Amino acid sequence: MKNIFCFLLVLFFQSFFSQDISKKLDQTTKSLLNEPEMYSANLSFYVADEQGNFIYEYQGNKGLSTASTQKVFTAMAALEMLGKDFRYTTKVSYTGNIEEGRLSGDLIVSSNGDPTLGSWRYTGYKPEDFQNKVIQAIKSLGIYKIGGNLIIDDSYFDIQTIPGGWPWNDIGNYYGAGVWGVNWRENQFDMHISGGANAGASTSFKKIVNLPEQVKWVNETHTAGKETGDRSIIYTAPYSEVAYINGTLPSGKMTVVSGSVPNPPMQLGLEMYNLLLNNDIEIKGKVTSASQLLIEGKEYAPLKGKEILVYYSPTMDKIVYWFMRKSVNLYGETLVKTFGLLV
């Protein structure tokens, strides 16, 4: 009789606490759904205890996109098929000859799609680390004048940089960045935008980090209340020369809005061009890329130059760490393309 009483007592308390948890979950769920940020969101979840007993659900039978949870499978595949020590490579080479410090050919940068090239996340692999090694490699050969072009060979992957089903209002933002054969700074730029003093006032650009070269900007954002948060959207597309941002930003403070660079290979090329000039290395030709030549209706065949630098990415285990920790879409898309070519 004593055992039966104890069993019933346990059931009573389990039922009591389950009801209490269920009530709290319901209140929290409804509160969450009333937030402005949840205006167009979908939510579905089901809660059970360790024994599988039902506690609470909100549209528990509704199917939703699995979204970033799929990254777990991509990460597992990368470690299994490519290995934790796998590294991407970026190479710098040249064509022609060097005579008395003058290079008669082209300077070429090529890669097998390294998504970490120029990333800010890894110690020893930041933009300046790559740039310094490029300059050191060129100066070690005594080159101070380049007679040809600076070519960014991004032909390793195809010219379609994003999947066909991505929404238009995603691809201009940082999480919608495409994948090129040569990526740079995670194909992301950051705009520091100052909200006005009052609701409805215009906003102003204060600083753009990794400013996309040759891109014309249209800013139609306006100021909203102090606690409204970032409700802006950037509209641009791969290879576009126009970017448009609208929506609202909070008043009285600076907001950092991150977007996707429309043409990372050309962005890297133009940065490198300025880097060469700032280091007293003259270049007579122009900056171009494999994809840019295709856009211009010209043919491009990868040039076999003389290598002067092989630059390695962090190992795959470190790439996967940031892929999972920050859910970097660029990494996932690059890994899938890499599987298609190497596995």
Regions found by a protein language model. Give the residues of each.
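Short active-site loop at a secondary-structure junction
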Residues: 57-77, 81
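Beta-lactamase-like hydrolase cores
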Residues: 19-51, 56-62, 89, 136-142
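Conserved serine DD-peptidase/penicillin-binding transpeptidase domain
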Residues: 27, 32, 81-343
